[in-house]
Amino acid sequence: MTLPTAHRLSEATTTTWPARTTHQEAGWEIRDGAGGGKRVSAVTLAQKDLADIEWIEATLTTLGQEHLFMIRDGDEILDAALAARGYEIIDPVILYLCETARLRPASLPRAQSYCIWEPLHIMREIWAAGGIHEPRIALMHRVQTPKTALLARSGDTPAGVGFLALDGEIAMLHAVEVLPSFRRRGVAKKLMAQAAKWAEDHGALYMALMTTRDNTAANRLYSSLGMRPVGQYHYRIKDPA
């Protein structure tokens, strides 16, 4: 089975975690993230050759946006140019991928995980505790493909949440959050199992997700489940002042 390419995963990410608006101009793709975080707010290069950095800096300043760039595989020239202009690396990210069938368990623990749309109030509270607030909930509502929110319990207590959406053969998992007092109790594994069941039931051959390189616990979990790192990206940022 041929795995999706890095470009295909980027398409799936855009579909399942969309900016409010995007447009291309002067060799750049410019996003309005509406407060939804770096991934939907960062500028990316939209051509092979290096575009005019001074132009995009001036444009971002006019728009009142951060000078924030996403650097993907193949963007090495842009990365070096931004470094020379004083932009610092922030939040290196690893992309993980796995065949859905490999993640789906034979059965799920009874009454320990659920697929729910729209998110319940308690789910919003768990997300908020992890810094995922209303702009990102609004982002989830913007997704136009099949989607669901995930809830997992620890015993009888709601303890973890996630968001899953489909783009063709790929189900992308986003916004995984487990309350600190319930970590290392298997809650994230329950979320992953429920996500895999939903994904396979909806025809997804693959499940993908991303996490920061510094999130040791998440990287350990995804590797232990048989997910493979298949790509990476990072951001470069500079105070527009």
Residue ranges and their predicted role:
Residues M1-A12, A42-A46, V93, A101-R136:
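Short amphipathic alpha-helix that is part of the acyltransferase structural core
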Residues M1-T62:
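N-terminal charged segments
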Residues G36-V43, I90, A165-H174, R183:
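A conserved beta-turn-beta hairpin within the catalytic core of GNAT-like acetyltransferases
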Residues L50-E57, V178, R184-K197, D201, ...:
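Conserved acetyl-CoA-binding loop-helix of GNAT-fold acetyltransferases
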Residues L63-D73, A199-M210:
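Conserved GNAT acetyl-CoA-binding A-motif
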Residues M70-I77, L209-N219, R236-P240:
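Conserved beta-strand-loop-alpha-helix junction that forms the acyl-donor binding cleft
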Residues A83-I90, S223-Q232:
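Conserved acetyl-CoA-binding loop of GNAT-fold acetyltransferases
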Residues A138-L179:
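A conserved beta-strand-loop-helix scaffold within acyl/acetyltransferase catalytic domains
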